[in-house]
């Protein structure tokens, strides 16, 4: 029985022909290559234990891993059921020494790192075997006579000298080769590992069978030093690995190393008990980072000094023993009850999970999980034990089809969406992909298997590999448009230089260990980084000379981020690596309280007020009480999808999903001011949104063959239609856009989409960019005219901040501005020739304290500790938490009033305990139980009343003026929570305005006789130009025609587009934040001018006109004075939002704050996120928000880890839905509006799962996705995970790091590293 897939048996099949062509038929027995016991990696519980085997497993912990073309990772792992005594003691494995072969005349046995014995028939010279269950190949060099099989296909990368050596055995797993040879002690040991590119890691052995040295693919040498740790006994010579020395950075190690010599670079050291058990691991600094305790050589405890501590109790202290209890210090205690085909695990919270199994020995598999709530998930396997189907608790099944070697060829989702791939029969390399929409991508490869051409719907991307030292690193990439990028690599296989399609060069320098120490951009601006010996980033010096420093505790958790001025954010950690406290430079502090399950149960904000969280049996958030007492409750279905949310007013919103778990509908409850409604969502097979329909509007999306959004049609309930149409180039960059009936806009771009021109009507805009592709000049001209309508110039500071700008109009207007920044990157002054110069001041938390304009009194601002605006000049002592809680009770009952207990006569309060500011700037505010502003009373008695629908969208308002007149307005929204119309009734006259949308950007205002179209700069919210046209209402016939074409996903034909009035073009001219301050016309004359204001953006207007855009993404509603800001409304007089952040605490601890109270530096175009434009104090404050989000999301996800193992295992097994997008130039443009559905449940359109944003973010925040820049040691990586949590958020929100990376994307376990895209 050969165990070979039928497609490789050839002449042994009848007639030498595979008549069925079936790739899943096997000849021989599935026992070939079968292990004596199943792998212990899945399932895992707790810290962790395998409930199927009862074994304690410590997954590999990396002690060091220095960058190399193929990085050598020195990792140790432990499995209690492994009886083998390694060089760290019984049950431990290390690279190189933990795998070996046993060859005899009758059999071949591969002993893996877990001590499992994988059995094969005898391996004669030249013979090969395949294990279907382990998915690996064995082949021996030489020939036993007869016709030898050629070393081609999967074996082509094996050097010729090994092909002919009978004393060489190759193990092929994925695309990695392990070369074994017989050592003097008679054991076949690992001599080298290598891949298709030829990078070799070599292992050197002593005559006693000790691994004494390793040479990695970068040429470094490592020396392993041993000691006599215990007395020799049967099967144990007592020798243990004392440590590993970095012996040489480039070259072989010295012939002799004295371990006692000073100055040796010990990468890791180990300490043992007198019984030979490992009791401590020391890092490169000599610090103890891991400790272990033993009884009769069985692990009974492990931990980290000052951190994790876990203890275990066993039924028997022997390798066949099983864990009966696991105790986490400060955490859960779990007990294990073993049955014949199941294990029940109960924890100290009284929850019981049941793991069910089938089969025996190496064929035993995990078949079902019954969770604490009774929900059941099931898993199916093929003959070789490979996962082929999953059924979730709702019975929804995902299936896979595999070929004879277990390679996945097709995946079918529960909704019957199919993804297919074709691989090369010999090498297993990807040849073709087909997605659920039947789009195909094909791959051409060179002799090494590198992808040289990828052809897809958008065209071809070509790759060249011209560096013989690094044959798998691309040196040239040509995109489908012909743009070419060049890449240079250093000896570690790290990117050294990148030349873009414009010839601009970015350079990267590394130290001897592959850590990025300096990077320079095409302007020569340099960024430097410093590291400690553990590879942790401790200093970052940016191009303008500003610097950030980082500190860590002994466990590698980040404890401090500070700027050059010493302004710091501090982090304190509790048990289980859970964040306990964060404090910023201004003294603001957030405290986190977790329960024994590691769930965040209380959060105390800077005002000493507490938010609380409750969870169900599965660790899902079921109740959340905010700082203001707003209580929200959540319900889920058996598949963990959110199905209902009950708000503080008792109203319930419900959610339904399709079979693929995508949001299908939302039922929004009725309120006093709006009826109940249902909003429905339809998806294409590949997961793109096809339509979103509600009571007032249906939005339909049409895509081109590549997947780019081609047409968005918004069909109102009364038949009115607005459509936006785009065309794209091969890179997915917009080339033309047509907004409704306005003239089309042609975009002229270069490279990956940098704008250098735009054509609209008879006007052309031209853009000049610097070497970093930042705009430095813009002008506009009419056809046939040499003179520019305007010229706009910009100069940038080293970090990209706007430093100077100048606008010159043909009509003579000349506007010049200069911007000043301090060492923290905060804007401290603006010099302006058209407006009074201004100076700004900030507190230590980065909040705007004052603005001083020439010739005017200073405007000053005060805040409580939580960032709520205060009135008055007096300072009050902080109230204690008890007083804050009592005050919060006002909101818990839904009661709100203007006075608070913190007020004193004649002054405002010292803080707003619930973050609901009730008085500011002479106005009084009242909120409902949900935190929505329902009334504003002005100093003159003017009264504004606001009313909301069940999705917390403003639908009605009345404004009673002091003179007794009244105004009334009503608003309508689509299913994406975009405002599509408003009707204003003033003095008995009703006016309706409709709005058209381009994704998240409002692009049109349609009045009864006028259409105004706003065109934004590509990819952002900064307005570029405006088109104004006279129009007439569509006749019924045209409306029907529009509806018919929209229903078919087609734009209205050009011959049917009504002739509107001549388009009048106006150009926006903005400040450093993208706020319009000037508007010029097509004659080069100034048409509108606004006066900048700290919180209002513009107030007043020097040349009044209809220009309602304020801060990016904001639209001034004249009828209310509010600014519509996509998902919320902004109160300009208060500098805050009128309702809470739909993202909840994910948007930060203060749900009303705008741009972190720094409107001179930051902006919020959607009312959800804050894309900060500077670093400095904001880095620290963004970190606080990141830590807050981490706490909530981690708390919600801890209970899902076990089921997630199967999903992760499933995903890691060549998931087509991941593969197809990771390594191909596919422009996966999401509809702008589909990132969130507004105040109902933001994020659910993209995840369709829970109230948190994404499981991937959870894994990142929990450290599972942590990486160091140079693949540094896992020990350092694990420590850096805490810093990574913080840094990722800071990098996203504060742009604190300017370096770029080329990212490698593995094709899962195919181990294919895709060229940078």
Swiss-Prot record:
Keywords: Virulence
InterPro entries: DUF6531, RHS, Rhs_assc_core, RHS_repeat, T6SS_VgrG/RHS, YD
The UniProt record lists the keyword Transmembrane: no
Ranges where the record places region Disordered: 395-419
Biased composition (Basic and acidic residues): 403-415
Result of knocking out the encoding gene: Deletion mutant together with deletion of its cognate immunity protein Tsi5 leads to a significant loss of fitness advantage when placed in competition with parental strains.
Listed GO biological process terms: protein secretion by the type VI secretion system
Molecular function GO terms recorded: toxin sequestering activity
Lineage top rank: taxon: Bacteria
One Pfam family per UniProt: RHS_repeat
Described purpose of this protein according to its UniProt entry: Toxin secreted by the H1 type VI (H1-T6SS) secretion system that acts on bacterial target cells. The producing bacterium is protected by a cognate immunity protein.
NCBIfam families: Rhs_assc_core, YD_repeat_2x
Name of the protein described by the UniProt record: Toxin protein Tse5
Species this protein is from: Pseudomonas aeruginosa (strain ATCC 15692 / DSM 22644 / CIP 104116 / JCM 14847 / LMG 12228 / 1C / PRS 101 / PAO1)
Taxonomic lineage: Bacteria, Pseudomonadati, Pseudomonadota, Gammaproteobacteria, Pseudomonadales
């Amino acid at each position: 029985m050969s165990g070979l897939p039928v497609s490789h048996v050839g002449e042994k099949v009848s007639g030498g022909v595979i008549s069925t062509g079936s790739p899943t038929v096997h000849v021989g027995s599935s026992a070939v290559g079968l292990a004596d016991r199943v792998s212990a990696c899945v399932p895992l519980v707790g810290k962790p234990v395998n409930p199927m085997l009862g074994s304690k497993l410590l997954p590999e912990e990396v002690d060091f891993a220095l960058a190399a073309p193929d990085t050598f990772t020195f990792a140790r792992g432990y499995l209690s059921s492994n009886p083998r005594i390694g060089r760290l003691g019984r049950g431990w494995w290390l690279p190189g020494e933990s795998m070996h072969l046993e060859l005899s005349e009758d059999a071949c046995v591969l002993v893996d790192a877990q001590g499992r014995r994988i059995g094969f028939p005898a391996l004669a010279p030249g013979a090969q075997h395949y294990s279907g269950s382990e998915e690996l190949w064995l082949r021996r060099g030489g020939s036993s006579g007869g016709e030898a099989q050629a070393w081609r296909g999967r074996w082509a990368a094996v050097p010729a000298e090994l092909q002919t050596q009978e004393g060489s055995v190759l193990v092929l797993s994925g695309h990695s080769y392990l070369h074994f040879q017989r050592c003097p002690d008679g054991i076949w040991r690992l001599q080298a590992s290598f891949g298709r590119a030829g990078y070799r890691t070599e292992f050197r052995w002593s005559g006693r069978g000790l691994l004494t040295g390793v040479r990695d693919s970068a040429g470094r040498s490592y020396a392993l030093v041993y000691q006599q740790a215990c007395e020799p006994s049967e099967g144990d010579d007592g020798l243990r690995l004392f440590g590993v020395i970095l012996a040489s950075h480039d070259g072989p190690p010295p012939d002799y190393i004295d371990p006692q010599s000073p100055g040796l670079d010990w990468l890791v050291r180990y300490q043992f008990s007198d019984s030979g058990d490992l009791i401590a691991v020391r890092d490169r600094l000599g610090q103890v980072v891991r400790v272990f305790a033993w009884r009769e050589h069985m692990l009974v405890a492990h931990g980290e000094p000052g951190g994790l501590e876990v203890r275990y109790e066993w039924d028997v202290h022997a390798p066949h023993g099983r864990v009966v209890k696991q105790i986490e210090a400060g955490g859960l205690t779990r007990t294990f009850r073993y049955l014949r085909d199941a294990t029940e695990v109960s924890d100290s919270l009284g929850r019981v999970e049941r793991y069910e199994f089938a089969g025996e020995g190496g064929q035993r598999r995990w078949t079902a999980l019954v969770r604490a709530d009774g929900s059941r998930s099931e898993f199916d396997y093929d003959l070789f034990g490979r996962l082929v189907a999953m059924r979730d608790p709702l019975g929804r099944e995902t299936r896979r089809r595999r070929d004879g070697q277990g390679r996945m060829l097709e995946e079918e989702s529960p909704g019957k969406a199919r993804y297919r791939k074709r691989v090369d029969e010999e090498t297993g390399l990807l040849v073709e992909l087909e997605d659920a929409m039947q789009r195909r991508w094909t791959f051409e490869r060179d002799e090494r298997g590198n992808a040289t051409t990828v052809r897809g719907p958008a065209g071809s991307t070509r790759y060249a590999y011209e560096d013989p030292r690094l044959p798998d690193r691309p040196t040239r990439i040509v995109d489908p448009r012909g743009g070419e990028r060049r890449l240079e690599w250093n000896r570690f296989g790290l990117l050294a230089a990148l030349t873009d399609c414009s010839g601009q060069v970015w350079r990267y320098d590394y130290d001897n260990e592959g850590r990025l120490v300096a990077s320079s951009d095409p302007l020569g601006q340099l960024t430097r980084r410093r590291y400690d010996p553990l590879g942790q980033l401790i200093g970052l010096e940016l191009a303008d000379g500003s610097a950030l420093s980082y500190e860590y505790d002994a466990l590698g958790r980040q404890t401090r981020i500070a700027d050059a001025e010493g302004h710091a954010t501090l982090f304190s950690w509790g048990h289980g690596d859970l964040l306990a406290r964060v404090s910023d430079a201004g003294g603001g502090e957030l405290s986190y309280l977790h329960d024994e399950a590691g769930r965040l149960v209380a959060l105390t904000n800077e005002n000493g007020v507490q938010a609380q969280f409750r969870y169900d049996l599965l660790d899902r958030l079921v109740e959340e009480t905010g700082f203001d007492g707003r209580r929200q409750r959540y319900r889920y279905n058996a598949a963990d999808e959110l199905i209902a949310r009950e708000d503080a007013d008792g109203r319930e919103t419900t959610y339904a999903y399709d079979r693929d778990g995508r949001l299908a509908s939302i039922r929004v409850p009725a309120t006093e001011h709006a009826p109940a409604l249902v909003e429905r969502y339809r998806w294409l097979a590949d997961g793109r949104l096809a339509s979103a329909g509600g009571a007032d509007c249906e939005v339909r999306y049409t895509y081109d063959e590549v997947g780019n959004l081609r047409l968005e049609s918004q069909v109102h309930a009364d038949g009115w239609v607005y459509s936006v149409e785009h065309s794209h180039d091969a890179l997915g960059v917009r080339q033309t856009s047509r907004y409704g009936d306005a003239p089309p806009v042609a975009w002229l771009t270069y490279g990956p989409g940098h704008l250098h021109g735009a054509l609209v009507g008879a006007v052309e805009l031209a853009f000049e960019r610097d070497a970093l592709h930042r705009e430095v000049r813009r002008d506009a001209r009419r056809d046939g005219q040499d003179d520019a309508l305007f010229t706009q110039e910009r100069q940038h500071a080293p970090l990209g901040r706007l430093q100077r700008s100048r606008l010159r109009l043909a009509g003579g207007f000349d506007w010049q501005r200069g911007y000043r920044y301090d060492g923290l990157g905060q804007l401290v002054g603006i010099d302006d020739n058209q407006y009074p110069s201004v100076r700004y001041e900030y507190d230590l938390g980065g909040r705007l304290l004052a603005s001083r304009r020439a010739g005017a009194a200073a405007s000053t601002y005060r805040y409580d500790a939580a960032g709520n605006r205060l009135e008055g000049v007096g300072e009050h002592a902080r109230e204690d938490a008890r007083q804050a809680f009592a005050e919060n009770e006002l909101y818990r009952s839904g009661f709100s009033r203007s006075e608070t207990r913190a007020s004193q006569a004649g002054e405002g309060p010292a803080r707003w305990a619930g973050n609901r500011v009730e008085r500011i700037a002479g106005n009084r505010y009242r909120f409902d139980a949900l935190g929505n502003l329902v009334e504003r009373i002005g100093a003159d008695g003017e009264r504004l009343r606001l009313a909301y629908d069940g999705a917390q969208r403003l639908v009605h308002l009345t404004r009673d003026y002091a003179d007794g007149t009244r105004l009334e307005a009503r608003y309508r929204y689509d299913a994406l929570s975009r405002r599509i119309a408003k009707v204003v009734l003033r003095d008995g006259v009703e006016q309706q305005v409709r709005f058209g949308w381009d994704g998240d950007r409002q692009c049109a205002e349609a009045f009864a006789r006028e259409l105004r179209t706003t065109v934004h700069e590509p990819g952002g919210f900064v307005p570029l130009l405006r088109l104004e046209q006279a129009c007439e209402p569509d006749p019924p016939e045209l409306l029907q025609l529009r509806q018919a074409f929209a229903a078919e996903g087609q734009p209205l034909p050009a011959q049917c587009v009504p002739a509107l009035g001549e388009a009048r073009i106006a150009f926006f001219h903005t400040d450093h934040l993208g706020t319009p301050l000037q508007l010029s016309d097509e004659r080069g004359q100034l048409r509108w001018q606004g006066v900048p204001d700290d919180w209002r953006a513009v107030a007043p207007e020097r040349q009044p006109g209809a220009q309602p855009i304020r801060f990016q993404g904001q639209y001034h509603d004249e009828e209310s004075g509010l600014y519509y800001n996509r998902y919320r409304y902004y109160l300009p007089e208060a500098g805050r939002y009128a309702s809470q952040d739909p993202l909840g605490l994910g948007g930060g601890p203060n749900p009303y704050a705008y741009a972190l109270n720094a409107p001179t530096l930051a902006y919020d175009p959607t009312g959800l996120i804050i894309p900060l434009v500077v670093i400095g104090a904001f880095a620290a404050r963004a970190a606080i928000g990141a830590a807050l989000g981490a706490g909530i999301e981690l708390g919600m996800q801890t209970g899902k880890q076990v089921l997630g193992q199967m999903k992760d295992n499933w995903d890691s097994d060549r998931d087509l839905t991941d593969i197809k997008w990771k390594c191909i130039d596919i422009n996966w443009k999401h509809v702008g509006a589909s990132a969130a559905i507004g105040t109902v449940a933001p994020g659910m359109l993209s995840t369709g799962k829970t109230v948190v944003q994404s499981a991937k973010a959870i894994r990142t925040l929990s450290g599972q996705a942590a990486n160091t820049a140079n693949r540094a040691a896992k020990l350092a990586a694990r420590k850096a995970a805490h810093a990574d949590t913080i840094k990722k958020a800071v990098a996203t929100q504060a742009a604190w790091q300017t370096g770029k990376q080329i990212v490698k994307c593995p094709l899962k376990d195919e181990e294919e590293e895709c060229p940078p895209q």
